[in-house]
Amino acid sequence: GSYAATQMIGSIVASVYHTCSSDEVEWIVKNSNAKIIFLGNNPNDNGEKKKMPHYRILPVLGQLDHIQHVVLMKNIEQSNHEKMVDWDDFINYGSDINESEIHAKLNNINVNDTASLIYTSGTTGNPKGVELTHANWSFEVSRSQEILEFNQGEKYVSWLPLAHVFGQLVDNH
């Protein structure tokens, strides 16, 4: 979905661990220079509002001037913040885009372009963003295919978060 589409237009994906505090989320969003935030569920929130991503971004959203939209994925509680938009409305924003524009962006991607930023846990200060290129991901996919056998139609379970390299690899590539 949004992960692949972001990379297909030449933009860079950065993920945030579901355990990050509001301050850590703010730091990563600013450091990555993100323009759009896609906000989903925290599978480990146990119904506690303070653990829900929605409640971690709200306290710092006012300090994130460069954010254009916070896109709320399906079944995420809507807020009255002007930057928050639900998934269906966000998709409708692109309804006038010509498909040839999308293909042109896709064709302009260079294998050495940054595809994603993976942030470290920040055990010695603020998290550091590690750049991974499209070539990095291609290499990882090809090596993984040599070791792991995935057949079309099979199902698997991945418990790794998208903020983890292997989580991104098996869930999105």
Task: List the predicted regions and their residue ranges.
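Conserved AMP-binding A3 loop
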Residues: 115-139
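Hydrophobic alpha-helical segments in the ANL/AMP-binding
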Residues: 1-16, 25-26, 144-145, 166-173
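Conserved AMP-binding/adenylation subdomain of ANL enzymes
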Residues: 138-173
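Conserved S/T- and glycine-rich ATP-binding loop of Class I adenylate-forming
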Residues: 6, 37, 114, 120-123, ...
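Conserved pre-ATP/AMP-binding loop-to-beta segment of ANL
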Residues: 85, 91, 95-119, 126, ...
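Short gly/ser/thr-rich secondary-structure transition/capping motifs
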Residues: 17-19, 96-100, 138-139
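Structural core segment of the AMP-binding/adenylate-forming
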Residues: 8-92
